């Protein structure tokens, strides 16, 4: 990455829409912008300026708004202008052509945030949280990313790295002046501090197992006999005709998927082949896919016909063997007088009892410990696990070893790993690995 270059990127999705935003950042922002506008644009004065963009023949390209951010008070820490133009991709491509012609270069994924990090506008954890925030599939992970963006990770780890640094310094002083050192007493004090730091780091790392399962889409598999209304339920949940609804038994032989949002959580729902005893070869293949979908699902909706409300005990046994949570839902409730615990009419789109139950389940599934610090990125967890391993080596060795020059190696290594989590002493390979997963314009 060459920070001497002025970069640009389309910050909005690349298709026709109401407006588009093109970001321009770097040392030559005002030189470039003044070559393609009908009036002078200065870093002082109005922060929002309306101008015409023009080409080399003075032909008008678009009527735009320029949002000006003057260094160092910008996202990147550089001079930055956001061009708000009309939403045609024809206009966007013309503007990009003008920027390229006058010396701007296409930004790499995550380069705006990376420059912000390098220019001291945010820590590495805050920078990484930006992408996690953009990609968060549910409100829980969104909140975790926002906490990191607010500096929660740095605030929790900085006292630990400071304490470790003091311990390393203390051991190095003792190595230089051994005649003034009571090694046994020093080690007792250090041992207490290292135990405390290790416990805190372990608490942080343990929480990642809970968070990991929330990163994948929540999957619901709809299963049941043929012609019980599974496709109608899928369509009712999606509020669109995604699956073919037919009175012919065995119509669905492949898995039909659909995505919908429920109370801030994205859900992937799978409509599966109907299960019955007498099947054609094609239906048997479809049923195998059904059981495959059950294995990958977080939750199973076992749909029953309210006129034949008893579930198949073999299917119930299989669900329990797989340790799958499941709901027994009685469909076609409009055709009977009897009321069940969860009764719906998918065809009539009367599914609110099921929606309420799903909402309650999702709330419980996505609930996390409020006071727990969560690291949303795997690289953070890996580095902390390495730090913990070094601290544990220290605790084991200090029981039988009084040589500070051996023990201090482990404290230095642990200190270094936590510094890397904080974005200090971080190698460029890790930095590039973090930012390459960002989207363009961020």
Curated annotation (Swiss-Prot):
GTP binds at residues 227-232, 246-252, 271-274, 331-334. Its main location: cytoplasm. Mg(2+) binds at residues 231, 252. Binds 1 potassium ion per subunit. One of its GO terms (biological process) is tRNA wobble uridine modification. K(+) binds at residues 227, 246, 248, 251. It comes from the Bacteria. Residues 217-363 form the TrmE-type G domain. Its EC number is 3.6.-.-. It is found in: Cytoplasm. Keywords: Cytoplasm, GTP-binding, Hydrolase, Magnesium, Metal-binding, Nucleotide-binding, Potassium, tRNA processing. (6S)-5-formyl-5,6,7,8-tetrahydrofolate binds at residues 23, 82, 121, 442. Its cofactor is K(+). Pfam families: MMR_HSR1, MnmE_helical, TrmE_N. Homodimer. Heterotetramer of two MnmE and two MnmG subunits. Exhibits a very high intrinsic GTPase hydrolysis rate. Involved in the addition of a carboxymethylaminomethyl (cmnm) group at the wobble position (U34) of certain tRNAs, forming tRNA-cmnm(5)s(2)U34. Belongs to the TRAFAC class TrmE-Era-EngA-EngB-Septin-like GTPase superfamily. TrmE GTPase family. This is tRNA modification GTPase MnmE. It comes from Mycoplasma pneumoniae (strain ATCC 29342 / M129 / Subtype 1) (Mycoplasmoides pneumoniae).
């Amino acid at each position: 990455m060459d920070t001497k270059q002025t970069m640009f990127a389309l910050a909005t999705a690349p298709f026709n829409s109401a407006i588009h935003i093109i970001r321009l950042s770097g040392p030559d922002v005002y030189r470039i912008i003044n070559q393609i506008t009908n009036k002078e644009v200065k870093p002082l004065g109005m922060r929002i300026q309306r101008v015409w963009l023009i080409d080399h023949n003075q032909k008008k390209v678009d009527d735009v708004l320029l949002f000006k951010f003057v260094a160092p008070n910008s996202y990147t820490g550089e001079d930055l202008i956001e061009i708000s133009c009309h939403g045609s991709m024809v206009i966007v491509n013309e503007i990009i052509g003008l920027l390229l012609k006058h010396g701007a270069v296409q930004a790499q994924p995550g380069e705006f945030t990376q420059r912000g990090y390098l220019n001291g506008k945010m820590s590495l954890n805050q920078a990484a949280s930006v992408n996690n925030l953009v990609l968060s599939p549910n409100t829980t992970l969104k909140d975790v990313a926002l906490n990191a963006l607010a500096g929660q990770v740095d605030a929790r780890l900085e006292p630990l790295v400071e304490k470790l640094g003091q311990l390393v310094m203390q051991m190095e002083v003792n190595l230089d002046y051994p005649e003034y050192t009571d090694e046994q007493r020093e080690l007792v004090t250090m041992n207490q501090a290292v135990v405390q730091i290790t416990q805190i780091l372990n608490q942080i790392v343990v929480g990642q197992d809970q968070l990991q399962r929330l990163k994948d889409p929540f999957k619901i598999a709809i299963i049941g006999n043929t012609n019980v209304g599974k496709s109608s339920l899928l369509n009712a949940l999606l509020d669109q005709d995604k699956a073919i609804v037919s009175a012919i038994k065995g119509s669905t032989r492949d898995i039909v998927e659909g995505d919908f949002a429920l109370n801030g959580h994205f859900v992937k729902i799978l409509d599966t082949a109907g299960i019955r005893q007498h099947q054609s070869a094609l239906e048997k293949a479809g049923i195998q896919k059904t059981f495959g979908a059950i294995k990958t699902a977080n939750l199973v909706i076992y749909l029953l016909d309210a006129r034949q409300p008893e579930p198949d005990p073999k299917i119930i046994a299989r669900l329990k063997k797989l340790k799958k949570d499941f709901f027994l839902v009685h469909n076609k409730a409009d055709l009977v007088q009897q009321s069940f615990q969860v009764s719906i009419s998918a065809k009539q789109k009367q599914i609110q009892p099921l929606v309420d139950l799903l909402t309650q389940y999702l709330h419980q599934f996505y609930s996390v410990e409020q006071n727990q610090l969560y690291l949303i990125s795997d690289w953070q967890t890996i580095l902390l696990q390495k730090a913990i391993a070094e601290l544990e080596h220290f605790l084991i060795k200090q029981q039988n070893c009084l040589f500070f020059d051996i023990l201090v190696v482990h404290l230095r290594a642990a200190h270094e790993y936590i510094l890397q989590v904080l974005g200090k002493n971080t190698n460029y390979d890790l930095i590039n690995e973090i930012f390459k997963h960002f989207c363009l314009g961020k």
